[in-house]
A protein has these predicted regions:
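TRNA-recognition modules of translation machinery and tRNA-sensing kinases, especially anticodon-binding
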Residues: 27, 130-426
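N-terminal alpha-helical targeting/anchoring segments
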Residues: 1-135, 149, 153
Length: 426
């Protein structure tokens, strides 16, 4: 969410940014926001003048009463009553206009970083760098579900009976590999200096609207019926929420957290859930990382975070690339985002396994996360990044380390988490 003062003073910049994101339908909102802001400031000025008049009049009443000027005192009393009634009306109107303005401001997208490529959708994202040269196997790679089923590692039919499409039972060594990936990712981030955290798996609505756009909220979040609670779509939401309405000391920054959580998503959108497989599902587990830092430090942290993801994947021998998200693919709160994609030998292309985002002060502004400064408090910057989402990591592992006989090599860094198991065999 942008500062209304910034919008007022940089109207054309804000409009040009909206155009870069191909959201021209939002252009009228800029003028509407400025108009509402002018009305609110006018009402504040009027109410300030009325309060000053009321205070002055109230001080006169006692003096007039002591001087036995009853009629004059009563006239002033009547004026004070009129002022109070007027203030009630003004405050009500100001509150209504402020709510309208807030809703509009939460719809206007954040200003994107100058390095972000301009494009309409993810088809125009730009490759930045590749890590580890992909290998083409001498035999055809089956679909990931077929690999897992041959390893007796999944029961989708039972899950479908229990919960419907978009869920699974993982079994045996596949379930163990899933947990090994999570445990390794946890230790990897702890060794990078991050504090390990297990957060709430449900959050209140004001936290939801503080961390994401209305469009994201509608397409992702499950609401608990009869409660002001939502199941988290990622632990970033509850980790950032930890700092709501907080004034942070400069010497306590940056705040770096890594967390494990189950994640729940409606996947209501263009992609939807996957009928057969574990790539796009309603429930999965994930290791996430977030940073709350000084504004000037967020670009450097952004580069660190996505490189951590690359380092994690390459430590397991998985080829990956970094893909810069274009303007039209960026969610409204994001300043910049890089997707990390793993190589799929079956498809002979890369697929998304994680995403790193710098949100500037958008989340901090919505949630009231400030830093204590010598000349007043100011908003922090927040960043988030996927450490690992095991369902997609499993696909990458199974495809890249599959042998023709159906066995799968376990990356060496995972051996300690697999009880020494080095190969998964059918």
């Amino acid at each position: 969410m942008l500062d209304i003062k910034f919008v007022r003073e940089n109207k054309e910049v804000v409009k040009e940014n909206i155009k870069k994101k191909f959201q021209d339908a939002k252009l009228p909102l800029v003028d509407e926001a400025i108009e509402l802001d002018e009305k609110i400031r006018s009402l504040k000025n009027e109410s300030g003048n009325l309060r000053a008049e009321r205070n002055s009049s109230s001080s006169k009443i006692g003096l007039l009463m002591r001087e036995k000027k009853i009629d004059e005192a009563n006239q002033i009393k009547q004026r004070v009553v009129e002022i109070n009634n007027k203030l009630v009306d003004i405050e009500k109107e100001e509150e209504e206009l402020s709510l309208k303005l807030k809703k509009i401001m939460m719809t206007i997208p954040n200003i994107i970083d100058p390095v972000v490529p301009i494009g309409k959708d993810d088809s125009e994202n730009v490759e930045r760098e590749r890590f580890i040269e992909p290998k083409t196997p001498s035999f055809p790679i089956p679909y990931h579900l077929d690999i897992i089923e041959k390893l007796h590692g999944i029961d989708l039919d039972a899950a479908r009976k229990v919960a419907g499409n978009g869920f699974y039972y993982l079994l045996g060594n596949i379930a163990r590999l899933h947990e090994a990936v999570i445990a390794y990712a946890r230790d990897f981030m702890i060794n990078k200096g991050f504090t390990y955290c297990i957060p709430p798996f449900m959050i209140r609505s004001h936290v939801v609207t503080g961390v994401m756009s209305f469009a994201e909220m509608d397409s992702m979040m499950y609401k608990i019926e009869g409660e002001d609670l939502f199941l988290i779509g990622t632990s970033e939401h509850s980790m950032i929420g930890r700092f709501i309405d907080t004034i942070l000391e400069k010497d306590k920054l940056p705040q770096t957290l890594t967390s494990y959580s189950p994640c729940f998503r409606k996947e209501k959108g263009a992609h939807g859930i996957e009928e057969r497989g574990i790539y796009r599902i309603h429930q999965f587990e994930k290791q996430e990382m977030i940073v709350v830092c000084e504004p000037e430090d967020s670009p450097a942290w952004f580069d660190k975070l996505w490189h951590y993801s690359v380092e994690l994947f390459t430590s397991m021998g998985i080829p990956v690339r970094a893909l810069e998200c274009c303007s039209g693919d960026l969610a409204d709160l994001k300043v910049r985002s890089i997707d990390v994609e793993a190589w799929s030998p079956r498809q002979q292309k890369y697929f998304e396994v994680g995403s790193c985002s710098n949100l500037g002060d958008a989340q901090a502004r919505r949630l009231g996360i400030r830093i204590k400064g010598e000349k007043g408090n100011y908003f922090a910057h927040t960043l988030n990044n996927t450490v690992v989402a095991p369902p997609r990591m499993l696909i990458a592992l199974l495809e890249n380390f599959l042998h023709e006989d159906g066995s799968v090599d376990v990356p060496e860094v995972l051996w300690p988490y697999m009880g020494g198991t080095k190969v998964l065999k059918p």
